[in-house]
């Protein structure tokens, strides 16, 4: 298993600089952010120009990685494939196909996305719509030797009341999406705050995991007693992502049992990339703090990996 990180935590830095830093600090892989330029939306970046991908861009990406002893674990473009606005949805699908094309040219690495949700429709209506939307995208990827994977992030900030905005947050929904030909980018942090045992959820499905995130979560029980499971209400409009009773952390600084998580991946036969997704507010806010957070994560995770 190799250790890498998702480059979205360094949105202002060019790929060449990120790759040089990663190689110099002992990382083995990068999961490259491949969003289009979408302003200051947090935890997105454009380190691969998927919408203008050509031979020169492929050479640039390969050169940055190869020159620093790094492999490419995946392309990351996580957006709402069930967006209620048809024009927005079409744009997301077009960019997702561009990411698939880029991934095919870069060796057939997986492409990460979300199911998403139309918040104005019921869950069952969204599932039926997804069953219409995703087969052409899965076929497009398969024809190019690329696996389309979905992260089990809740995306509660996409729903006005903090309900799940990405219908891939539980094992029940994973089984449904596997039937559509989708794969899983497993992240234990989301399950922890949902009250789902990450290890119990993972073990039956390791063979469907093509990429694994390393992100921790910290739950504050006393705050949950104040706000309830669904989080803040009267102040939600100030920050729809802040539920008030939990937060993401660097691996090892929250409550996920990472030794057992990595062991469960190994036991199930996973030998891919463990990719740190850095969204820790304590170790963020400046380039220096982000780097320090990644170094803490590496120190905590590297002893768990074989090779």
Where are these regions (language model features)?
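N-terminal pre-domain/capping segments
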Residues: 1-109, 124, 131, 135, ...
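Acidic/histidine-rich catalytic cores of soluble enzymes
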Residues: 2, 125, 135-255, 305-306
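Active-site beta-loop-alpha junctions enriched in small/polar residues
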Residues: 6-10, 33-37, 77-80, 116-118, ...
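Conserved beta-strand positions in the central sheet of alpha/beta enzyme cores
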Residues: 31, 74-76, 112, 149, ...
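A short, acidic, amphipathic alpha-helical segment used as a generic capping/interface helix at domain edges
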Residues: 253-267
């Amino acid at each position: 298993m190799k250790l890498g990180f998702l480059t979205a935590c360094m949105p202002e830095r060019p790929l060449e600089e990120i790759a040089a830093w990663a190689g110099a600090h002992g990382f083995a892989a990068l999961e490259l952010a491949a969003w289009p330029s979408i302003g200051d939306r947090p935890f997105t970046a454009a380190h691969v120009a998927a919408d203008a991908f050509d031979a020169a861009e492929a050479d640039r990406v390969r050169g940055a990685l190869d020159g620093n002893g790094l492999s490419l674990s995946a392309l990351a473009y996580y957006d709402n494939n069930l967006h209620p606005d048809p024009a927005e949805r079409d744009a997301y699908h077009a960019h997702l196909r561009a990411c698939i094309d880029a991934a095919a040219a870069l060796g057939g690495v997986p492409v990460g996305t979300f199911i998403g949700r139309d918040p104005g429709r019921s869950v069952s209506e969204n599932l039926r719509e997804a069953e219409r939307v995703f087969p052409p995208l899965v076929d497009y990827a398969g024809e190019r030797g690329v696996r389309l994977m979905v992260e089990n992030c809740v995306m509660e900030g996409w729903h006005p009341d903090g309900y799940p905005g990405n219908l891939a947050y539980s094992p029940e929904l994973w089984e449904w999406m596997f039937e559509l030909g989708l794969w899983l980018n497993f992240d234990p942090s989301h399950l922890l705050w949902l009250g789902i045992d990450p290890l119990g959820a993972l073990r039956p499905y390791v063979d469907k995991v093509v990429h694994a995130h390393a992100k921790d979560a910290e739950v504050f029980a006393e705050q949950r007693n104040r706000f309830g499971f669904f989080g803040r209400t009267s102040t939600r409009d100030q920050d729809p992502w802040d539920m008030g009773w939990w937060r993401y952390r660097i691996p090892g600084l929250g409550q996920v049992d990472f030794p057992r998580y990595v062991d469960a991946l190994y036991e199930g036969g996973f030998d891919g990339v463990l990719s740190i997704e850095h969204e820790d507010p304590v170790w963020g806010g400046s380039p220096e703090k982000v780097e320090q957070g990644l170094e803490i994560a590496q120190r905590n995770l590297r002893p768990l990996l074989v090779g």
